[in-house]
Amino acid sequence: GINFSNKSYNHMVYGLTVVEIINKISFDNNPCEIIFRLVKKTLEKMNVSDNYLIKIYYLFFQLQLLIYIGFQPSFFKCFKCKTKLNVGSFCIEIGHMVCLKCSTKKIISIEKKGLDYIRFLMTTHIDNIYQNIPDNKKCLNSINNVLNKFILYHISELKKCKLFTNELENELI
């Protein structure tokens, strides 16, 4: 079972945030087996991980959940001109990644290393995540920032999610 009693504050916050996200987006009396397995496995992994890895499992959870509920982010091509992204700028007006040429603000939201790690998290089984852990906190924070903006744009229910919105105010790492 899951036991956060002897763990850190981060274990509890991230675990409860996962549960609160599911609570806000789930429909009553409409269980989804695949999302249940995602939540269960994520919480189990968080329970036995150090603080750094917990946050990576949290990013994994968010990406996989978006895929399962039909909001798979397109982080690898510009939403406007469809060119492959080497760096991306999150366009808050349309809720998607764009290239710097199409960006109105010309601000890089995420570097290539971050895009590559998103691809890894989207295509890797949760049991294999430990094999590729970036040591770059800036990279993880940029992924977290872009994911949070994407989620809040596309899933408005999470604006009412206190833990999720509080987590936005702080850096991931």
Language-model segments: what does each one mean?
Residues 1-173:
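Non-catalytic alpha-helical scaffolds and adjoining flexible linkers that form interface surfaces
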